[in-house]
């Protein structure tokens, strides 16, 4: 114990360091625990310090939990520490069942599906990716494939479970794609296997088994065969609401492997597996869209949605699309009223549905000057950045106690870029931050990224000298009081999907939950909570599952079975000019996340989940927690190239079936100021300035390649 008590230096070198190995840091920063730092040792290595004093291992401590060095003579002491943040999930987390497992004689894959109006390749109808009327009433399906071929057997068994019985003469299960469009080699009615009651719900079971490839006159099934199939969800008469006849999702099962996202080959449109490097959302990745419904890209179930989660997903979607004022569904009045949503809003709010801001699960649009920004969120504060006494922390323009509204008065143009100037009607806050609703896809995957992997990317003091100094936003868990890494929101203010959903319900819709039981309120305001009850816990559960299990489209680089070289060249330019300094390509998600859909997946979000100072050009006047006005969380880029058609929607000039076309609306960055992806790049300042400068230095042809890459995401 020869180090000075005031720390700052290690006197343990040579033989001492052999017996008392120093705890070293190799990635430039000691982190994860409060009061950690580092010193430079005599050999040039960086040693971790705690409260200024160097840390060592004792040579007899070999495994976690060893305390041999805690000497009664005082030559060694264990260090008690407080963790900087608590992980969301660890080895004590309760895990939902895996979507795939092995038995002694089979590979078993289990997942969920929903009804479709038409088939995946029928662009003439544009009716595959939308949601049918009453999608939430007894119309989810669970599918199980028992693959005996994978273990040396000869047949494949497919079991289908429904909540409403299928029509005995139309419960068709089509196997082995033949083409064109929706034609299969083997169409047959599934065998009815009986029903069972689980937790008060009656389930109906159907089965199809086969041991031949395509048809009975060919060979047997072999490893690697591509079994494309589609289950007809034709309901038996008597279902409460809606039509009886529906189709299902087109799935591709690779014998011996599992369900995979697919592309349609040029010519016969036969399905093939998309290379895994283009599965942006890991196993949640859905197939390419061939039904020409560009506004519906962000609405889809994860391909690997859990066997027991299909109905929960659909019920959560209903919560998302139903008014918290009247309970009415926004897509079709025939979908009726969700009574458990009705009457939950307090005296003030921004909008009455989640989908009113996140239309089609995309971002909000930028409206004309003078029009109310009623799909935006304005965080507000007093001169010191604290909640405004007359407004609270968020401007809420609707309800019986409206706080006023805001619109864009004009734009300031400079060098081809524009920034908005706002006009408030009512109280003008001293400080504020304008936010459009972000895209919702991939949220569960972002929640599943391991905290240590996020923190490993942080370099708050720019030790490596690359000009990028991202940092984690450590926030307080509103439920447990623990410190956690913030992940969601423009400034990473919430740690989980559930926290983010409950926070938005509170400030944006004026709905109280068990997580946030008190509504937003300024010190000079009264009757903030009103008399509305809290949101039912079950509805918050289903909404969280829905938001967590939305599928991600694959990178659009392989639609025709050959890699688009322009996209790949653009990817190299993106890497080479430094964009990946913030837009991290790849993570492996946690093995401890409760949801199998997002657990232990390789994903490509193109975000480091860190806060970065983006310079004065993008700064607002309001901080949020520890995030300054100039700091923003790196936005994930998956879905970027699809966003304009989702936000803008479609028009149908003729009204004829199949006549819809995209009306793109380009609105990028936190306030939608960027009218193109290139403008968004050119707005990058601060830590993003070097990459911006490098982009501007590219040849025009190289700029177009890089934009092509970004549009492919």
Each predicted region: which residue ranges?
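Compact beta-sheet-dominated domain cores in extracellular/mature segments
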Residues: 2-84
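Periplasmic c-type cytochrome electron-transfer domains
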Residues: 84-713
């Amino acid at each position: 114990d020869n180090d000075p008590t005031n720390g700052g230096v290690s006197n343990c070198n040579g033989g001492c360091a052999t017996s008392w190995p120093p705890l070293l840091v190799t990635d430039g920063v000691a982190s994860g625990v409060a009061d950690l730092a580092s010193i430079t040792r005599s050999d040039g290595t960086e040693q971790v310090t705690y409260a200024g004093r160097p840390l060592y291992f004792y040579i007899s401590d070999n495994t976690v939990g060893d305390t041999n060095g805690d000497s009664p003579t005082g030559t060694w002491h264990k260090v008690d520490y407080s963790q900087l943040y608590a992980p969301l999930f660890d080895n004590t987390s309760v895990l939902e069942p895996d979507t795939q497992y092995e038995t002694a004689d089979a590979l078993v894959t289990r997942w969920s599906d929903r009804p479709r109006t038409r088939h995946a390749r029928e662009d003439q109808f544009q009716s595959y990716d939308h949601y049918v009327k009453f999608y939430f009433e007894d119309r989810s399906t669970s599918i199980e494939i028992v693959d005996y071929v994978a273990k040396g057997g000869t047949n494949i068994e497919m079991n289908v479970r429904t909540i409403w019985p299928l029509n005995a003469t139309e419960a068709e299960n089509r196997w082995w794609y033949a083409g064109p469009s929706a034609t299969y080699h083997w169409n047959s009615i599934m065998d009815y296997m009986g029903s069972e009651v689980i937790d008060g719900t009656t389930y109906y079971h159907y089965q199809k088994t086969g041991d031949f490839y395509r048809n009975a006159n060919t060979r047997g099934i072999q490893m690697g065969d591509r079994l494309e199939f589609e289950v007809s969800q034709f309901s038996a008469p008597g279902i409460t609401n809606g039509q009886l006849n529906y189709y299902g999702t087109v799935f591709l099962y690779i014998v011996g492997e599992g369900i995979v996202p697919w592309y349609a080959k040029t010519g016969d449109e036969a399905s093939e597996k998309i290379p895994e490097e283009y599965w942006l959302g890991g196993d949640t990745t859905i197939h390419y869209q061939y039904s020409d419904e560009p506004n519906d890209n962000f609405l889809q179930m994860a391909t690997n949605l859990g066997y027991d989660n299909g109905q929960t997903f659909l019920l959560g979607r209903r919560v998302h699309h139903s008014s918290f004022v009247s309970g009415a569904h926004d897509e079709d009045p025939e979908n009726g009223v969700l009574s458990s949503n009705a009457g939950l809003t307090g005296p003030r709010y921004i909008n009455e549905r989640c989908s009113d801001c996140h239309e089609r699960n995309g971002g909000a649009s930028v409206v004309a000057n003078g029009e109310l920004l009623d799909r935006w969120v304005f965080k507000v504060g007093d001169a010191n950045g604290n909640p405004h006494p007359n407004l609270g922390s968020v401007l809420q323009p609707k309800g019986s106690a409206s706080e006023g509204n805001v619109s864009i008065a004009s734009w300031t143009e400079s060098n081809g870029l524009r920034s908005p100037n706002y006009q408030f009607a009512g109280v003008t806050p001293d400080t504020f931050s304008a936010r459009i609703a972000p895209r919702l896809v991939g949220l569960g995957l972002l929640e599943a990224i391991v905290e240590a992997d996020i923190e490993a990317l942080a370099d708050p003091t720019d030790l490596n000298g690359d000009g990028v100094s991202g940092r984690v936003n450590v926030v307080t868990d509103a439920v447990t009081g623990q410190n956690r890494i913030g992940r969601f929101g423009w400034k990473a203010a919430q740690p989980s999907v559930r926290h983010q959903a409950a926070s938005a319900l509170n400030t944006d819709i004026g709905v109280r939950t068990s997580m946030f039981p008190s509504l937003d309120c300024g010190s000079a305001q009264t009757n903030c909570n009103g008399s509305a009850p809290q949101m039912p816990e079950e509805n918050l559960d289903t909404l969280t599952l829905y938001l967590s299990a939305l599928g991600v489209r694959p990178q659009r680089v392989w639609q025709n079975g050959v890699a688009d070289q322009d996209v790949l060249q653009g990817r190299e330019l993106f890497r080479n000019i430094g964009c990946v300094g913030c837009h991290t390509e790849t993570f492996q998600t946690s093995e401890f996340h409760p949801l199998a859909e997002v657990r232990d997946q390789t994903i490509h979000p193109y975000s480091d989940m860190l806060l970065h100072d983006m310079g004065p050009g993008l700064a607002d006047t309001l901080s949020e927690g520890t995030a300054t006005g100039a700091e923003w969380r790196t936005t994930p880029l998956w879905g970027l190239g699809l966003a304009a058609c989702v936000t803008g929607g479609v028009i149908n000039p003729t009204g004829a079936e199949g006549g819809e076309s995209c009306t793109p609306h380009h609105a990028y960055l936190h306030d939608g100021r960027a009218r193109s992806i290139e403008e968004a790049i050119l707005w990058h300042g601060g830590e993003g300035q070097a990459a911006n400068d490098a982009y501007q230095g590219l040849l025009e042809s190289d700029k177009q390649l890089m934009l092509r890459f970004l549009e492919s995401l």
